[in-house]
Amino acid sequence: MSKQQEHNKPISDRIKIAVYGGNGFVGTRVAEALVDRGVCAACLSRSGHKPLHLKDQKWSETARWCKGDASDPDTQLLERMDGLVTLVGSPPLPTFSKQAYDQQVFVNGTTNAIAIQRAGEAGIKRIVVVGAQIPFFMRRESFGYAKGKNIALQAAEDFSKLSSEHRAVVLQPGMIYGRRYLESGKAIPLDKIFKPFSWLMPWQFVSVEKV
């Protein structure tokens, strides 16, 4: 079916996708791509607010901006969805305390795993998990970010084994760079800093514009 045909459908008949982390740096790009294809995207975040820097972007008026916590998903909402995209995470920073380590594991792993499990219980049969391509020297249990991503990966694998109809796609891009925005809407041009690295190591750096 063409994008135009999907756009012409009434909202009640469109494909509905829940996006946990949908108001974040990468999540907003995913939501935009879904809306562009005529999908009804429910962007879930703890605030439930549309980011200020999107206020003048037409596509953002079509997406649904909802309050939701991936670590405590709304099962009734998921039951109305046809698919799930989960990309909750935090930067791959080193940790120097058990509390910080546990938080890295929870945000990057446990949170996504809970969302995936609840999606299966809600009857969803298609999910997409956005992970990360982690350099070899960082793939160790002592690095909370890597351990968390592995937990999410295992949850996706378990989901795909629920039945022959269940499908899980795991995307593991390199470092995604681009212009970030503060809650105030102010832009931080990190794209100018990381773009030269993408020329030197294109396999490790991905522009958010290509998401």
Predicted features, each with a name:
Residues P91, G131-P135, G174-Y177:
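Active-site segment of SDR-like NAD(P)-dependent oxidoreductases
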Residues K16, D82-G83, R126:
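Structural motif
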Residues P10-R37:
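N-terminal Rossmann NAD(P)H-binding glycine-rich loop of SDR-like oxidoreductase domains
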Residues T111-N112, P202-V211:
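Substrate-positioning beta->alpha
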Residues C40-S47, K98-A152, L162-V169:
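Conserved Rossmann-fold NAD(P)-dependent oxidoreductase catalytic core, especially the SDR/UDP-sugar
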Residues R140, H166-K195:
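Flexible, glycine-rich beta-alpha linker
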Residues H49-K50, D56-I114, R118-E121:
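NAD(P)H-binding glycine-rich loop region in Rossmannoid oxidoreductase-like domains
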Residues D102-Q103, E141, S198-V206:
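Glycine-rich "substrate-gating" loop/helix at the edge of Rossmann-like oxidoreductase active sites
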